[in-house]
């Protein structure tokens, strides 16, 4: 599948481009713009600076560094993070707590940049992301495979539907498999038709597909699955050049609307 012609993709508005160009962004994160296309991706989802936007599992804040400043003055950015108490005691719980703490520290260190982002903690098996019908846009980047493997995908999509306003948008970017994958698949990829079916089962309508994050060099047949590729690079160091030439994964970019 060929990537979309960049000339045919929506361009980010001036405020969004300013956030993308911000000197507060982690330099390592900026290097990945060539693979993640934040401006065109967010423009495709129809983001506006006045919206309430919930980002699901923001991790280290790659998109947070763009979204929070963009929404600071007129909108609202909400980071939805897994409730550490919902994770079994041990390394997993410690990691969940540490991830939230580090993101809070990032925001607190530069209030003039990020303002006061909100946090919501959720339980993956029974998620609630806020007051019903309160969000304009829900975003999730490269997370669906984890929910599938944990058996939580149905509950997560239902939670997205509940928190969105009628007409609200769900934007999904995910590693794209060649076809539907079985329930026990550990590759990190998900079939595009499969993902669309998940969203539609929750009540969403598919409103658009973009190839902005496509990568035809991704053969999707690696020993460590998608984690073989950058940025995880789970491979022998001798193969660095090989996988760097492929780049990050082939990704579907899907826009859904709440009816």
What do these predicted regions represent?
Residues 48-59:
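Conserved class I S-adenosyl-L-methionine
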Residues 243-259:
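C-terminal lobe and adjacent flexible extensions of AdoMet/dcAdoMet transferase-like proteins
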Residues 127-138:
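A short acidic, Gly/Pro-enriched loop at the edge of an enzyme's catalytic core
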């Amino acid at each position: 599948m060929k990537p979309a012609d960049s000339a045919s993709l929506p361009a980010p508005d001036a405020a969004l481009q300013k956030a993308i160009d911000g000197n507060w962004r982690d330099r390592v994160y900026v290097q990945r713009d060539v693979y993640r296309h934040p401006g065109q991706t967010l423009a495709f989802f129809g983001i506006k600076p006045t919206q309430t936007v919930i980002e699901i599992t923001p991790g280290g804040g790659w998109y947070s560094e763009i979204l929070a400043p963009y929404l600071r003055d007129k909108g609202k950015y909400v980071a939805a993070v897994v409730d550490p108490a919902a994770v079994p005691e041990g390394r997993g719980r410690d990691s969940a707590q540490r991830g939230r703490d580090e993101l809070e520290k990032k925001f607190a260190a530069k209030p003039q940049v990020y303002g006061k982002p909100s946090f919501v903690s959720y339980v993956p098996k029974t998620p609630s992301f806020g007051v019903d019908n309160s969000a304009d846009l829900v975003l999730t980047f490269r997370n669906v495979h984890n929910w599938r493997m944990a058996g939580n995908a149905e509950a997560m999509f239902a939670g997205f539907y509940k928190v969105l306003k009628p007409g609200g948008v769900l934007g999904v970017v995910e590693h794209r498999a060649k076809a539907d994958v079985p329930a026990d698949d550990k590759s990190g990829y998900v079939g595009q038709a499969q993902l669309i079916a998940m969203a539609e089962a929750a009540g969403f309508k598919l409103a658009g597909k973009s190839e902005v994050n496509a990568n035809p060099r991704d053969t999707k047949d690696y020993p460590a699955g998608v984690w073989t590729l950058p940025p995880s690079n789970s491979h022998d160091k001798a193969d660095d050049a090989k996988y760097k030439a492929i780049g990050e994964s082939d990704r579907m970019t899907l826009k859904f609307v709440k009816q």
